[in-house]
Amino acid sequence: LQYIERLDPEREPGRLTFIVRMGADKIRDKLPELVERSPPPATVAWITDPMHGNTYEAAPVHKTRRFDDVLDEVKGFFEVHKSLGTHPGGIHVELTGDDVTECVGGGDEIFVDDLHQRYETACDPRLNRSQSLDLAFLVAEMYRDQ
């Protein structure tokens, strides 16, 4: 928050975008203070990146993420904004339309033991087609309920 004055001294709406990536276990505790200490809500676009704060090593070879943790961080993001009367600006996720096995959980019930089957990422684990659609529908419901 110390950079706000330098980056947006005129408080131009839409100039600043804050992308938070805290992890499902921290979002509800840490985000409220950041939102409350930031400039008026109309000047900042808030986005959550629920992927990076929920990455862990499942085996010596595979980084992964639990779909339920990703979803919980998104839910926490929406809950915090709703409780503060601010607007959740969006989400950033890594995903693919392919049927990869890089993140565990979701409607297809991918387990850690399944990761080796189609672990194709060159960098970070992505949600597969089914997990991406599951998340998209759940986020649409969250926006509807805002």
From Swiss-Prot:
One GO term (biological process): chorismate biosynthetic process
Complex and partners: Homodimer.
SUPFAM superfamilies: Aldolase
Class of enzymatic activity (EC top level): transferase
A GO molecular function held by the record: 3-deoxy-7-phosphoheptulonate synthase activity
Catalytic activity: D-erythrose 4-phosphate + phosphoenolpyruvate + H2O = 7-phospho-2-dehydro-3-deoxy-D-arabino-heptonate + phosphate
Record organism: Streptomyces lividans
Pathway annotation from the record: Metabolic intermediate biosynthesis; chorismate biosynthesis; chorismate from D-erythrose 4-phosphate and phosphoenolpyruvate: step 1/7
Family: Belongs to the class-II DAHP synthase family.
Protein name (record): Phospho-2-dehydro-3-deoxyheptonate aldolase
UniProt entry keywords in alphabetical sequence: Amino-acid biosynthesis, Aromatic amino acid biosynthesis, Transferase
EC number: 2.5.1.54
Pfam families: DAHP_synth_2 (PF01474)
Entry superkingdom: Bacteria
